[in-house]
Amino acid sequence: MNSIYQYKLATGEEIIGELLEEDEDFLYYKNVLTINRMIIDNSIVHTMNSWITGQFSDNDDTTIIAINPSHITSSNIPTENILNQYRKSISYYVQDSDLQDNQLNLLLCPP
């Protein structure tokens, strides 16, 4: 079963993320990104950005985001193209977070 879902929120934002669990009040996600649509040279291009600042700063993979389902106006199973871009974006954010952590450690604790 695919645990990655795409939602349109009441705010107009479009997000994608990995569903971990749900209860009667919230949906619990990790790795939530916004999907932004742009038209460049008559082609549709999607960019993905971190929805919550700092969610990729922990290497222990424990940042969980609770989403109130009453704020969701529509849902979708992402296309293969969107899924591939999502996976690449997540890899980038995780790698970038590791680089930032290493740089910060060097600044705080020089060799």
Name each model feature, range by range:
Residues N2-P111:
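Conserved RNA-binding domains used in RNP assembly and mRNA/RNA metabolism
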